[in-house]
């Protein structure tokens, strides 16, 4: 059966057809569509596949470990910075091993289209000593899922699959299986000595995983996804990984004249690389992200070949690749006999018309006119756009949950007033522990939890704390007297400003919750309601 699928959708369909029992994820571009596809899949509903959003990536990874412990196949999805959040269980999952297969799907974002950095997740796979896959097209993304699950169960290791933005968000026709594999049965074969990571047991597992590394490398050498393609002109060779291989092939519609080593499975296949460095005078390494392969080739490969790539300037050190960049690196002429597209009028990002965050920033800015030394610590979400004109309201945005802890640290340093602004989903993701720290030390900060009843930035997914924030804050020790809820509307501006003024001047932890539904989800709900009424 053929389907036209996004890269993310091909991954999701591949997981379902491979006998998936549960997907665990926190939404983050460019990975969000994987979980959404599974949530909407008739096959997933028929089979009872667990597909709910997790509070954060760490809880997602740990839940997947629990499913694997019981012998079922699990998928964990996140964007690249989410892998930092779940690094503890991710790395330790190599020590526990797997019972049912686990695939950790990480979507990297070269050029930082919607992220605060462009870190390369392949380093995590190497660090954790587990197999890593990087599809070069949507068909490979689909096919790799079944093979990755088999690999995970055979090796008793999780498998990391890395995709990038262009792979995740481009479409292609994918040949899918006619019939999906059956889901694993529940089993109790997990050995307690593997899963209880006391030092005595963990040392043994560490030795086992270390001893597996030559096998993983040989599997990469033998993998059908790592191909050595001979070329007539051996002056230059090209090593291309993931989607960069597609860009290379686009440069040569009639076939590349140089030897090409396509890499889509790691650890790097040293035998194949050695063949190229022995045969070729120059080797260009084309890879999305950091010079992961290039660093290793320079460090461990013998041979006389001159290595070129991101570290030598033939390719840009940062940002995405494209066919023109690869042509230039190969010394080819870049065609200019085409009419360029007309410049698109600039459309800077902005908070939506009618968004409750706008009213919050308007009130906050007006109050802080009386406090010229005030500092507002922001967080990750739609409200980060409050940094831009016309509000220019926040002074920092580092990572999920940092607003509260940075405000506390600034207060510890003597800053007043110190205000944190954080969204509802980000608060439950990683803000609660920071608030607990602040309460325990009676920090002099004001926390604004801007609650729009959804995870708006990534498309309106459910927020774990909806209708629970007052109870959560009370449970963390916030005083009832200094826990306020307001409705961010222009007509309520006087009340909102008065509340902010009062809580800033309270010397302790205070929390303000401006609550109003996201305009985008509100419009969607109204459309759904009208459609239902017509039936």
Give each language-model segment a name.
Residues 1-12, 18, 135-351, 356-357, ...:
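Flexible, low-complexity linker and terminal segments
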Residues 1-138, 164-166, 231, 257, 387-511, 517-532, ...:
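Thiamine diphosphate
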Residues 34-37, 63-65, 86-90, 112-119, ...:
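Short acidic, glycine/serine/threonine-rich loops at helix termini
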Residues 39-44, 249-260, 471-479:
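Short helix-loop-beta junction
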Residues 45-54, 96-107, 185-193, 440-453, ...:
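A glycine-rich helix N-cap at a beta->alpha junction
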Residues 71, 233-258, 401, 405-407, ...:
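Short, acidic loop-beta-alpha module within alpha/beta folds
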Residues 77-78, 103-107, 160-164, 239-240, ...:
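Short beta-strand segments
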């Amino acid at each position: 059966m053929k389907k036209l699928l996004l890269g993310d959708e091909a991954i999701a369909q591949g997981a379902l057809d491979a006998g998936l029992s549960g997907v665990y994820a926190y939404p983050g571009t460019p990975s969000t569509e994987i979980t959404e596809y599974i949530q909407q899949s008739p096959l997933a509903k028929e089979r009872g596949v667990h597909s709910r959003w997790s509070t954060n990536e760490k809880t997602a990874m740990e839940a997947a470990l629990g499913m694997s412990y019981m012998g079922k196949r699990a998928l964990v999805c996140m964007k690249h910075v989410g892998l930092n959040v779940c690094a503890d269980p991710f790395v330790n999952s190599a020590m526990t091993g797997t019972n049912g297969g686990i695939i950790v799907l990480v979507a990297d974002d070269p050029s930082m289209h919607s992220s605060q950095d462009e870190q390369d997740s392949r380093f995590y796979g190497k660090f954790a000593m587990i197999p890593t896959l990087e599809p070069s097209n949507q068909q490979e993304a689909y096919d790799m899922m079944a093979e990755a699950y088999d690999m995970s169960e055979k090796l008793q290791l999780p498998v990391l699959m890395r995709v990038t933005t262009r792979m995740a968000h481009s479409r292609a026709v994918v040949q899918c299986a006619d019939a999906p594999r059956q889901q694993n049965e529940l089993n109790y074969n997990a050995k307690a000595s593997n899963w209880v990571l006391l030092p005595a047991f963990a040392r043994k597992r560490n030795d086992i995983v270390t001893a597996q590394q030559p096998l993983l490398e040989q599997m990469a050498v033998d993998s059908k996804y790592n191909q050595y393609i001979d070329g007539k002109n051996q002056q230059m060779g090209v090593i291309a990984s993931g989607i960069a291989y597609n860009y290379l092939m686009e440069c040569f519609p009639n076939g590349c004249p140089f030897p090409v080593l396509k890499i889509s499975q790691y650890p790097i296949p040293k035998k194949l690389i050695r063949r190229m460095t022995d045969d070729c005078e120059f080797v260009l390494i084309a890879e999305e992200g950091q010079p992961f392969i290039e660093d290793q080739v320079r460090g461990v490969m013998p041979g006389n070949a001159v290595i070129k790539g991101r570290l030598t300037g033939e390719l840009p050190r940062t940002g995405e690749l494209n066919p023109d960049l690869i042509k230039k690196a190969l010394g080819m002429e870049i065609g200019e006999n085409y009419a360029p597209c007309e410049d698109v009028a600039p459309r800077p990002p902005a908070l939506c018309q009618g968004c409750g965050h706008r009213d919050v920033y308007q009130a906050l800015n007006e109050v802080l006119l009386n406090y010229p030394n005030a500092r507002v610590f922001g967080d990750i979400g739609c409200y980060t756009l409050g940094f831009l004109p016309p509000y220019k309201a926040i002074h920092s945005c580092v990572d999920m949950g940092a607003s509260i802890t940075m405000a506390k640290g600034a207060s510890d340093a003597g800053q007043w007033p110190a205000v944190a602004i954080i969204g509802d989903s980000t608060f439950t993701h990683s803000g609660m522990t920071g608030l607990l720290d602040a309460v325990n030390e009676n920090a002099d900060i004001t926390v604004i939890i801007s609650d729009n009843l959804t995870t708006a930035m990534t498309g309106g997914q459910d927020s774990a704390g909806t209708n629970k924030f007052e109870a959560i804050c009370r449970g963390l020790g916030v005083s009832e007297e200094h826990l306020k809820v307001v409705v961010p509307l222009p007509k309520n501006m006087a009340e909102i400003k008065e509340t902010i003024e009062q809580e800033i001047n309270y010397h302790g932890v205070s929390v303000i919750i401006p609550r109003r539904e996201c305009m985008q989800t509100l419009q969607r709900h109204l459309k759904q309601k009208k459609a239902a009424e017509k039936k």
